[in-house]
From Swiss-Prot:
SMART domains: EAL. Residues 13-255 form the EAL domain. GO terms for biological process: regulation of bacterial-type flagellum-dependent cell motility; regulation of single-species biofilm formation. The lineage of its organism: Bacteria, Pseudomonadati, Pseudomonadota, Gammaproteobacteria, Enterobacterales. InterPro entries: Cyclic-di-GMP_PDE-like, EAL_dom, EAL_sf. Its EC number is 3.1.4.52. It catalyses: 3',3'-c-di-GMP + H2O = 5'-phosphoguanylyl(3'->5')guanosine + H(+). Involved in the control of the switch from cell motility to adhesion via regulation of cellular levels of cyclic-di-GMP (c-di-GMP). Part of a signaling cascade that regulates curli biosynthesis. The cascade is composed of two c-di-GMP control modules, in which c-di-GMP controlled by the DgcE/PdeH pair (module I) regulates the activity of the DgcM/PdeR pair (module II), which in turn regulates activity of the transcription factor MlrA and expression of the master biofilm regulator csgD. Effect on flagella is controlled via the c-di-GMP-binding flagellar brake protein YcgR. Disruption phenotype: Disruption leads to increased expression of adhesive curli fimbriae genes, including CsgD. Also leads to a severe reduction in swarm size and swimming velocity, and 80% reduced concentrations of c-di-GMP. Disruption of ycgR, or concomitant disruption of dosC, dgcE, dgcQ and dgcN completely restores motility, suggesting these 4 genes, together with this c-di-GMP phosphodiesterase, form a network that regulates cell motility by altering levels of c-di-GMP. PANTHER family: CYCLIC DI-GMP PHOSPHODIESTERASE PDEF (PTHR33121), CYCLIC DI-GMP PHOSPHODIESTERASE PDEH (PTHR33121:SF78). This is Cyclic di-GMP phosphodiesterase PdeH. Keywords: c-di-GMP, Hydrolase, Nucleotide-binding. GO terms for cellular component: plasma membrane. GO terms for molecular function: cyclic-guanylate-specific phosphodiesterase activity; nucleotide binding.
């Protein structure tokens, strides 16, 4: 700790640059869009709430949301999650009327920190159609059990096939739905052997969850492949591009 302080004193330019970068991310502004998730039969099953991040100095340029959430603190991330929950709560009638789910992205540390927020937990209990989508797999603390994580409702796992979300995740937590990353989907489609492996992989994953959702479907051919696979649902630009949250009531309920 003392060494870090000495290093900062001896290198004031780096310290100033760090403060400026932190201030930059704190000045960023958020807006929200939604993207539908369709079952392979064409029925709308859920919508994902997506965060659009911009900076006042260049509001037309979108910044990477994952970088934004990495740069802000856990307490700030909890404020964002609360903001997202409040926004979706205003659309409760839409989700209830059509029997739809809504997913909100969240990282592991923020999810665990939410356990200390009784007001937010009570709000979550009043929204049975809300789902938290983990953007990374988290190992449960030693004093935690899966039962203790169920207070958030059924959990989804995002980006299966990336570094953080892999097979080790399947045995530790019983996820409701698991999303396969587009990168893995595209890689396996490149050869007949890969297509066979993709089908086998989905069969295996279905043993550990209610269904697999394929992300990043961008062409008619990709959508057809997903429909002919053991996948439960899909999401991507071919099905629908993200739209402003204000237009949620215009969602196409069946393709």
């Amino acid at each position: 700790m003392i060494r870090q302080v000495i290093q900062r004193i001896s290198n004031p330019e780096a310290s100033i640059e760090s403060l400026q970068e932190r201030r930059f991310w704190l000045q960023c502004e958020r807006a929200y869009t939604w993207q539908p998730i369709y079952q392979t039969c064409g029925r709308l099953m859920a919508v994902e709430l997506l965060t659009v991040v911009t900076h006042p100095l260049n509001p037309s340029q979108r910044l990477p949301p994952d970088r934004y959430f990495t740069e802000i603190t856990v307490s700030h991330r909890m404020e964002v999650v609360k903001e997202q929950i409040d926004l979706l709560a205003q659309k409760a009638d839409f989700f209830i009327e059509h029997g739809l789910l809504a997913s909100v992205n969240i990282d592991g540390p923020t999810l665990i920190a939410l356990r200390q927020q009784p007001k937010i937990l009570r709000q979550i209990e009043r929204l049975p159609w809300l789902r938290f989508e983990l953007v990374e797999h988290i190992r449960l603390p030693k004093d935690s059990t899966f039962a203790s994580m169920c207070e958030f409702g059924p959990l989804w796992l995002d980006d299966f096939g990336t570094g953080m979300a892999n097979f080790s995740a399947l045995s530790e937590v019983r996820y409701d739905y698991i999303k396969i990353a587009r990168e893995l989907f595209v890689m396996l489609r490149q050869s007949p052997e890969g297509r066979t492996l993709f089908s086998q992989l989905l069969h295996l994953m279905n043993r550990y969850c209610r269904g697999v959702i394929v992300e990043g479907v961008e062409t008619p051919e990709e959508w057809r492949d997903v429909q002919n696979s053991p996948a439960f649902a899909a999401q991507g630009w071919f099905l629908s591009r993200p739209a402003p949250i204000e237009t949620l009531n215009t969602a196409v309920l069946a393709l």
